[in-house]
């Protein structure tokens, strides 16, 4: 556990982690302070951050399970202590840490007698099981248990739909909420018109994110929500400027990215995510599938590397360069 003394800043707005601990593999706790804030600002930020922490962060979980010769969800299987429903509920609790986008497959294939735990899940390399000791089922006889799983990244809580699954697959209520709980409190200090506030923010996570990672992710998501308002004003200004400006010749892709890298020197490129650059949905999804999430990831690839991405075209490469040149005001 890490604790630090709280020193209140009287000038520049600063945030700090004052307590951090891991109570178990699936329970992390962090306490943060932000100060100094003007009267009323702490509550504004605290409410927004709590909602973003609980509702805007994506998590990874099992959303479907399939096993042969299972007549219905509430049936039992000879040689297995738990019913099918109980196994599904145990699978629902498995916590994953991943950066995958979309849906991936996983599986369990074991032979009894033995206990089945999360360690027995065969998952893609991009998916890590947070607690491999999580219990799934108990095989009491020498039988085979094979389950196909569907793993998905999403956010919030999604209730399974009551459809008819004749292929032997069963949906699982998706709980894609890495943050278990979040609270904020406010401490006021000073007198009269000089009154200021300190915001205390407490975060509990399930281990798929640390509290600090969750705080950063929630902050980024909040920023993304407000970007359209900023871009609307920028677009109006650009339209006026472009009426009297000649179109400049395009850089080559290599020179353009080199120039961008120089302009961004001194800024943490790994903190600039590509979803902040207003890329077209298809281009954005192609980059995400290739594990290109930040500007640093993008600048680490050459034009040839990008052209190797499935469904990627030379027009996409030119479009990316144009958007980044505009974003970072390259002359």
Curated annotation (Swiss-Prot):
It comes from the Eukaryota. The keyword Chloroplast applies. It is found in: Plastid, Chloroplast. It catalyses: RNA(n) + a ribonucleoside 5'-triphosphate = RNA(n+1) + diphosphate. GO terms for molecular function: DNA binding; DNA-directed RNA polymerase activity; protein dimerization activity. It holds the Pfam family RNA_pol_A_bac. Its main location: plastid. CDD domains: RNAP_alpha_NTD. GO terms for biological process: DNA-templated transcription. Keywords: Chloroplast, DNA-directed RNA polymerase, Nucleotidyltransferase, Plastid, Transcription, Transferase. The keyword Chloroplast applies. GO terms for cellular component: chloroplast; DNA-directed RNA polymerase complex; mitochondrion. It is an enzyme of class 2 (transferase). Its EC number is 2.7.7.6. Disulfide bonds: none annotated. InterPro entries: DNA-dir_RNA_pol_insert, DNA-dir_RNA_pol_RpoA/D/Rpb3, DNA-dir_RpoA, RBP11-like, RNAP_asu_C, RNApol_insert_sf. Residues 268-331 are annotated as: Alpha C-terminal domain (alpha-CTD). Residues 1-233 are annotated as: Alpha N-terminal domain (alpha-NTD). In plastids the minimal PEP RNA polymerase catalytic core is composed of four subunits: alpha, beta, beta', and beta''. When a (nuclear-encoded) sigma factor is associated with the core the holoenzyme is formed, which can initiate transcription. The N-terminal domain is essential for RNAP assembly and basal transcription, whereas the C-terminal domain is involved in interaction with transcriptional regulators and with upstream promoter elements. DNA-dependent RNA polymerase catalyzes the transcription of DNA into RNA using the four ribonucleoside triphosphates as substrates. HAMAP family: RNApol_bact_RpoA. Belongs to the RNA polymerase alpha chain family. This is DNA-directed RNA polymerase subunit alpha. It comes from Illicium oligandrum (Star anise). The lineage of its organism: Eukaryota, Viridiplantae, Streptophyta, Embryophyta, Tracheophyta. The gene is rpoA.
